[in-house]
Regions:
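Macrodomain-like recognition of ADP-ribose-binding/processing modules
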Residues: 1-153
Length: 153
């Protein structure tokens, strides 16, 4: 199924899984979307941080929290909260998602903006390469617009 690129508020998605980029240290990030996610799902972030501090979460992987609607997928694409998003980590996470989505019982995924606009130009071809051939329906948010539902998520 093709990838759909949308703009809007990922928190309003109808997809059962919301994926977003995060760091391997489990530290809070300061963007508007990250702050909204942290305020809405504090238990998910606390558990994720605990797993990071214990060394169970590595860059290039993802970790799922299924105790919310939508479920949350922390895509570990940065080593630290102030570090750059690494192409190799994005590639690894996308490859795993495209290959193993059935193991995680995923029927569709909405992916929140993974990084800033400048980094996204380099990452979009990588994301597209790994997800376009997958039968998993994917909606990728290119721009975060608070309070606005995307048309096809």
């Amino acid at each position: 199924m093709p990838i759909t690129y949308v703009s809007g508020d990922p928190l309003l998605t109808r997809s059962p899984m919301l994926a977003f980029g995060h760091n391997a240290k489990g530290r809070s990030e300061l963007g508007a979307l990250e702050t909204s996610l942290l305020n809405r799902y504090p238990a998910a972030f606390a558990t994720y941080g605990k797993n990071c501090r214990s060394g169970r979460i590595k860059p290039g992987t993802f970790w799922a929290w299924r105790e919310s609607k939508p479920s949350l997928m922390f895509m570990v694409i940065r080593e630290t909260s102030v570090g750059a998003t690494r192409v190799r980590f994005v590639e690894s996470a996308m490859m795993t998602l495209a290959r193993d989505y059935r193991l995680y019982d995923l029927t569709s995924v909405a992916i929140a903006p993974l990084t800033n606009t400048l980094e996204w130009k380099a990452l979009k071809p990588v994301v597209d390469y790994w997800l376009r051939a997958s039968p998993l329906p994917v909606a990728i948010y290119e721009a975060y617009v608070p309070g606005v539902a995307a048309e096809s998520t």
